[in-house]
Regions:
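Formylglycine-dependent sulfatase
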Residues: 1-210
Length: 210
């Protein structure tokens, strides 16, 4: 895990903001230094980290674990799914139930968003910087089934499911799933903005989107 590690002592936006007196967090994906190396997030300027520490494992939105600081946290209800897993032999690629094993209990975007709100709550009285490195809408295109079906009903059935996606999992409705992912992220950004307004922090917060 942790491809392309940064050199020890590299100056990052995290270290700069720490020096300026801010509490810092990175929530999402970090692929710049694996666990127990000199380039893991906590050693690169981030007081708190939660998310993926590997580009490849981030291909799944229903992982069986995520990292919280330097601890691997297993997600109860999500089972291990090998990278490059495929539909079961003989499964109907046009039957939505054939894809059940890829869509599990806990959607990683929601787990990360919970940590975002928690970090904001805990640091409301302090200067803080949050880096939200969302994995949306990277492949594998996955979203909660009800949100995908909203777009299937709106856009119609798709005739070309992805059954062999290389490093990514099979997807029955790739276009609808992609749209659902964007909508899901948009809703979470909206929730965060509203939360900051409710807390009286919005006017004193700078948003940088890249």
């Amino acid at each position: 895990e942790g491809q392309y590690p940064l050199a020890a002592g590299t100056e990052t936006i995290g270290t700069m903001m720490q020096k300026a007196g801010h509490k810092t967090a990175l929530i999402g994906k970090w692929g710049l230094g694996g666990p127990n190396t000199a380039a893991e997030p906590n050693k690169m300027g981030f007081d708190y980290f939660y998310g993926f520490n590997c580009q490849m494992w981030a291909h799944s939105y229903y992982p069986d674990f995520l990292w919280e600081n330097d601890k691997k946290v297993f997600i109860e209800g999500n089972e291990y799914m090998p990278v490059c897993a495929r539909l079961d032999e003989g499964a109907d690629p046009y039957d939505i139930r054939s894809y059940d094993k890829f869509n599990q209990k806990h959607y990683s975007c929601d787990l990360m968003y919970e940590k975002i709100e928690k970090f904001v709550d805990e640091n409301a009285d302090n200067p803080f910087m949050l880096v939200w490195t969302t994995t949306v809408p990277h492949s594998t295109v996955q979203a909660p089934e009800d949100e995908v079906m909203y777009y299937v009903n709106k856009l119609g059935e798709e005739k070309t499911p992805i059954t062999d996606g290389g490093w990514y999992y099979p997807v029955l409705y790739p276009k609808s799933a992609y749209a659902a992912m964007i909508t899901h992220l948009d809703a979470q950004v909206g929730k965060l903005v509203q939360k900051l307004k409710d807390m009286g922090l919005y006017e004193n917060t700078v948003f940088i989107v890249t």
